[in-house]
Amino acid sequence: MEPLDMELEEGELELPAEPMHLNMGPSHPAMHGTVRIVLELSGETMVKADVQIGYLHRGFEKMCERGTWAQVFPYVDRLNYVSPMLNNVGYALAVEKLCGLVVPDRCQWYRMALGELARISDHLTCDGAMAMELGAFTPFLWFVKAREMVWDILEEETGARLTHSFGRIGGMANPPTQDFKGLCRAALPKIVDLVEEGERMLLKNRIFIDRLENVGAISGADAVGLGWTGPCLRATGVAYDIRKAHPYLKYDEVDFDVPVGTKGDTLDRFLVRLGEIRQSKRIIEQSIDRMADDGPINCDAPSVILPEKTAVYTTIEATIQHFKLIMEGAKIPAGEVYSYTEGGNGELGYYLVSDGSGTPYRVRIRPPCFQITGGLSKLLEGRMLSDIVPTFGSLNMIGGECDH
Amino acid sequence: MPTFKLDGKTLPFEPGDTIIRAAWRQGIEIPHYCWHPGLSAPANCRMCLVDIQPKPGQRPLALDVLEWDAKAGEYLPRQKPKLQPACYVAAADGMEVLADTSEHVRRARHDVQEFLLLNHPVDCPICDQSGECKLQDYWLDYGQYQKRMRDEPVHKPKGVVFGPTIVYDAERCVMCTRCVRFMAEVAKDPVLDMRERGSLNEIIVAPGRRLDGHYTFMTEHVCPVGALTTKDFRFKARVWFLRTARAVCQGCATGCNAHLDYDPRSNRAYRYRPRDNEKVNKFWMCDEGMLSYKEAHDGRILEPKVRGVATSAGKALDEIKTVFAGVAPGSVAIVLSAEHSLEDNWALYEFGTVLLGSKNVYVTGRRDGYHDDILIHRDKNANSTGVQQIAPVAKPLRMLVDDVGASRVTHVIALGGAAPVDPEALGAATMVTIAAHEGPLSRLAVVLLPATSWAEHSGTYVNAKGMRQVSEKAIEPLGVSKPAWQSIAQVAAALGYEASWTKLHEIRARMTAVKGIPNTARPPAAVPAE
């Protein structure tokens, strides 16, 4: 029997090459929270990738504008919920800038140490999860083990592991515990050991390197054009770190380096984060060395700082102070302010407007993830479908921060 | 007009004004406890002390003091300006006064505040004044210190019942004597006084008397702290949960301006507070008026009824259609209500005279009652003058009783439940009543439709002096009640007529067009474009 296609040209055997449409997310385990990427595929190559955020929407800024200034702290915990301390400190600094308050030195060192712990937790989560999504489960467990050590310290200090709500206008909720310095000194070498162990396992792994190297690369100029900041920008070789460029707290008094990449690809982003963990360790060590063991942690500002609880129960003055601050909120002088700090993912900016009342008139948040996620489709288009997972993972998009 | 300078700002004043009053007229508050714009000034709280600059060439008023010098480690003789009470010193042309800008004045306020709180109990969590207390406000504005006294504070009587309405707490009292002066100067019944001196000082009621009469609530209203509380509001609500509407008291034809405080969560009115209006009630209200906020909830009609049996609005309107079938317009009477707003009355008036074509217009309302020459008016209706303006020909309800008796009127559409005369004879007529509150006319009604009270809708009321005042909506309508003007449009529709209004502003515009009644609720006219 003759084959049926005997007369046909070889070219005609091919299937029609119409692009295939595919939804990645919003409910997909690699879509970190809820992002949807509408893909147009030619074979396995992405012709077009339309990144859509907005599936996690809480009306975040509007919520902040309904309570008192102090009631915003629990909300900002839920921005980048892997490093809530950085968000707390960033918001506190913004309100303090509006009030013209400067917290005591002890509090500044404390805020730096806690913030850098949060940054370590943030970077460990990002790199660990990225490895896991590429099939490397063991390093993920090691990184999370190291993160648990960070969270143990934060729990000891704040009482909560994840959403601490620990910042206060003009200070912190509590002074450092007696064990704080000891806990940090004990945990930091162990954390770096675990990071190095994970590194040895991953960076000699051919499959891991091949899936990261030259994938999702972006030039420094493009990244700046997109408004990128943080580790993703530094991976392209642009050494912009707000802690160096516009120092706040005591960052100008400590020694640390700004790790940068060269190619701006996924591997660089992975490595920059690991580098920053080591720098954070240096900052924490210097901070706890220089932080006094006693002294005030809060500003001497009765108009924003809550009185001592025993005084509230026994004296009318403290009762009035407590009542006014809780029921009406601290009256923040009328005006507007933009204050920015280096968050886990880059420039975390707060634009606040006060009408002089106890409630924020406007809270606008510049979350670093928003701009970074905006560049995702540029990284993806032309790449293979399987490149989404490492590329997206390396951007460390956090749904809570992308709430717009 | 002469002027003086307060903190470098030039303020005009009327000759005879004290510094504090001149500032108050310009909306600037000099902190004070004992001064009240409606009362005399005893200058006893010392909170309003200001630094009056000497005239050029004059020696400044100064005090010799010993001040601790930390550097020298001893007390050194110094001089500081002698401060004077702003509530007692009359403003003079060209006078220069320092208040907020003077370090000495701020220091004095701080110290006065510390003295006033010296023996104050830790009562904020259980005090009704909390949230609107001057002690709290001024501590934050001028105090911001912590307690230095380590002794047990002086204890004084708490929960002293002054009379049927007022309870006194001597520990919270700052001895400003506003209540004493109110009773003596405004209520003309000097029943309150002080006894003892210093930290044992307290307010008492004259022996053999109680704090009673028609103006006792105002003693609580003038109290700048939580010393006087009313039995009515005590422990009922926390003020920061309350919202307020600018209302007009419905108790009598004076039409006192009031704040109606309500809780939007429970949709309940909680109290009245007088709203300052120099032309009507100045700063005051009477006890009956202060308690009349309760009428937003008490004695209300909340569902339609046919012959006393509750039913739906649709069935009630069907019944109206049935009982009005084939009735000649000449035998229908409409009864306006001096209790209801201009808008409600206008709707009924237009429906009755224009749509139905009836010429029988009557007016009802509450009976006259107690009156005095302070605030309380004989006429207990908020809008008698308004009804007069809409329908000058309206006949009193007494004549309707006669007309029904003589069978000249067989059907009645009435607004409001109250009646100034015994209306039992109206039972012979078929009556439709639209009312917010129970009364003789609601009991006689064949069909009864619920209306919203003044608290649940915006309405205009004309007081005895002929002043049109708008009372704002506070709470949401209770039950299935709706504004009477809406129900009247529905009654008109049931009888086959189309009302000319569907919105409140249409009624207001129509009253202006037809009767020339100025539209009080209309926003100011826009500036015409070039």
Q: What are the language-model segments listed below?
A:
Chain B
Residues 1-2, 43-48, 253-256, 523:
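A short, compositionally biased
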Residues 2-12, 16, 24, 52-57, ...:
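N-terminal export/assembly segments and adjacent metallocofactor-ligating motifs
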Residues 19-53:
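A basic, amphipathic helix-loop patch mediating RNA/tRNA/ribosome contacts
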Residues 58-77:
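Intrinsically disordered, low-complexity Ser/Thr- and acidic-rich flexible linkers and loops
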Residues 326, 351, 355-361, 365-520:
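Non-catalytic alpha/beta scaffold blocks inside enzyme catalytic domains
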Residues 520-530:
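Acidic, Ser/Thr-rich low-complexity intrinsically disordered segments
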